[in-house]
Amino acid sequence: MTSRFCSAALAVAVLGFVHGASAQPVKRLFFEGDLVRHPIENQTGPFCVLTSQFKRNEAVAWRIRVLDSAGEVADDKVLKSVVVELGDGQKLPAHFGPHPARGAPPTDYFWSVHWVIPADYPTGSLGYKVIATTMDETNQTWEPFKRAPSQLTVIAGDPEMKK
């Protein structure tokens, strides 16, 4: 009797795991990205070079790659949107496309958006997060490290202009 009960209990437990295993797996997204200075006419640059400190009237560019759980690039056929949300609440929609965008043949494809820092914007660190939305309206958010020295920072001064 005891061995039959144990066998029945084991069968029920195994069937319970089989049912749980057939559930849809959670689809996770993975984010890669950086911040660079976006070119603005008559500014000297350097452009498309990693930095986290920007002066007013310079343009911050976010370069973002989103990967699916299989490690494949999640482009605009996989994601409905990618949005950068600044710490002050501004939302900047990113676009998927080739880079460089003009001139030379593309070397890469990723999501990007740029924002020109207003002349009167306060100095200091400015947090942000990146929100990817899948076609089924599922959102996933990524945020950089929260230590002030590694955050996007607006610093005093004017951008250098070409002479």
Model-derived features: positions:
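Bacterial N-terminal signal peptides that target proteins for export
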Residues: 1-9
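Sec/Tat signal peptide C-region and signal peptidase I cleavage site
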Residues: 17-23
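Beta-strand-rich domain onsets/edges
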Residues: 23-61, 65-68, 158-163
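Short flexible loop/turn segments that cap and initiate beta-strands
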Residues: 54, 58, 66-97, 128
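Aromatic sugar-binding surface patches on proteins
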Residues: 103-116, 122
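Exposed beta-strand face motif in extracellular beta-rich ectodomains
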Residues: 124-130
